[in-house]
């Protein structure tokens, strides 16, 4: 790809300094990410193990597979950011975001690893789950799909941007919904709270990919975008309805397929394409916690995790003595 055709990819020495801000929308996303910073120490897991013991074997098996996939997937996302996106994109606003995203993906991976470490007592089983990419075919399939985009030498930045929007917006969506389903039962407060925080973060990451896509002067054709999304949808459907079917936790597999299609349609719209599936959201409990990363988790903030003053303007922080008493 001729990077000189894309301003955000064109080499410039300006990438080494942050100011002046040129891309306000991209900078705003970076500040949102910073405002949402959290650490694993802020998640209370003290009540989770007693709930874990109450789950059926099917429910435990489902959660194990989900956590195993998540524990590995954040590392794959980071590999793409470190090896490809951060070095390719030349504007400092986006590089700030990607740098911070790498830190957050590390926290996500630590969180999932800690959850596995908390629930699974047998060391051999822990090791099996920590190495899910090698040990579980269903996880390996999703990992290999993402890795092929990292390693691709002939696909454009725009195409790979769509692929990783699909990873964070589609590959994660069904699993997030399944954990929110568990929350409805009032179980596993640590798991479900961390799921709120991580799904909010990933929603922002997916939104950011869509914003970067809109800054491309020569984006991939709609047909190419659609094919990438459809491929991701089919892999995710297989993951949650065949490999580790959500019926294990009492969810309807057909409705899960519909939900994945609904999420995919929304992503297609954000990427400037028409809907492909025209599916409605079958899960009312996901209406306010869907992967939009906009008002649901940032302005409304269910978890109320936003660092003080990060999103304020300089004029909001002026000290004054002219107040009437």
From Swiss-Prot:
It catalyses: a 2'-deoxyribonucleoside 5'-diphosphate + [thioredoxin]-disulfide + H2O = a ribonucleoside 5'-diphosphate + [thioredoxin]-dithiol. The keyword Oxidoreductase applies. One of its GO terms (molecular function) is metal ion binding. Its EC number is 1.17.4.1. Fe cation 1 binds at residues 74, 105, 108. The active site is at 112. SUPFAM superfamilies: Ferritin-like. It comes from the Viruses. InterPro entries: Ferritin-like_SF, RNR-like, RNR_small, RNR_small_AS, RNR_small_fam. GO terms for biological process: deoxyribonucleotide biosynthetic process. It holds the Pfam family Ribonuc_red_sm. Fe cation 2 binds at residues 105, 168, 202, 205. Keywords: Deoxyribonucleotide synthesis, Iron, Metal-binding, Oxidoreductase. Binds 2 iron ions per subunit. Belongs to the ribonucleoside diphosphate reductase small chain family. Heterodimer of a large and a small chain. PANTHER family: RIBONUCLEOSIDE-DIPHOSPHATE REDUCTASE SMALL CHAIN, RIBONUCLEOSIDE-DIPHOSPHATE REDUCTASE SUBUNIT M2. This is Ribonucleoside-diphosphate reductase small chain. It comes from Yaba-like disease virus. The lineage of its organism: Viruses, Varidnaviria, Bamfordvirae, Nucleocytoviricota, Pokkesviricetes.
């Amino acid at each position: 790809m001729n990077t000189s055709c894309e301003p955000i990819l064109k080499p410039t020495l300006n990438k080494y300094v942050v100011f002046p801000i040129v891309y306000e929308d991209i900078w705003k996303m970076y500040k949102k990410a910073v405002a949402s910073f959290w650490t694993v120490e802020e998640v209370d897991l003290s009540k989770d193990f007693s709930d874990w013991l109450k789950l059926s074997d099917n429910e435990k098996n489902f959660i194990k597979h989900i956590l195993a996939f998540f524990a590995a997937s954040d590392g794959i996302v980071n590999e793409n950011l470190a090896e490809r996106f951060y070095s390719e994109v030349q504007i400092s606003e986006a590089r700030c975001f990607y740098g911070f995203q790498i830190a957050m993906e590390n926290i996500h991976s630590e969180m999932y690893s800690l959850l596995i470490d908390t629930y699974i007592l047998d060391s051999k089983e822990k090791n099996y789950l920590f190495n899910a990419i090698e040990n579980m075919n269903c996880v390996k399939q999703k990992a290999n799909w993402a890795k092929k985009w990292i390693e691709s030498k002939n696909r454009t930045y725009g195409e790979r941007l769509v692929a990783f929007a699909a990873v964070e917006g589609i590959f994660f969506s069904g699993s997030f919904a399944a954990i929110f389903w568990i929350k409805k039962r009032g179980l596993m407060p640590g798991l479900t709270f961390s799921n709120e925080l991580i799904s909010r973060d990933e929603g922002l990451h997916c939104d950011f990919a869509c914003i970067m896509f809109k800054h491309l002067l020569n984006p991939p054709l709609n047909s190419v975008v659609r094919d990438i999304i459809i491929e991701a949808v089919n892999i995710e459907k297989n993951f949650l309805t065949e490999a580790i079917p959500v019926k294990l936790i009492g969810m309807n597999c057909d409705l899960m397929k519909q939900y994945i299609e609904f999420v995919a349609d929304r992503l297609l719209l954000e990427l400037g394409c028409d809907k492909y599936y025209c599916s409605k959201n079958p899960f009312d409990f996901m209406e306010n916690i869907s992967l939009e990363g906009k008002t649901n988790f940032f302005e409304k903030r269910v978890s109320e995790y936003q660092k003080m003053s990060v999103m304020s303007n300089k004029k909001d922080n002026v000290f004054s003595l002219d107040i009437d008493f």
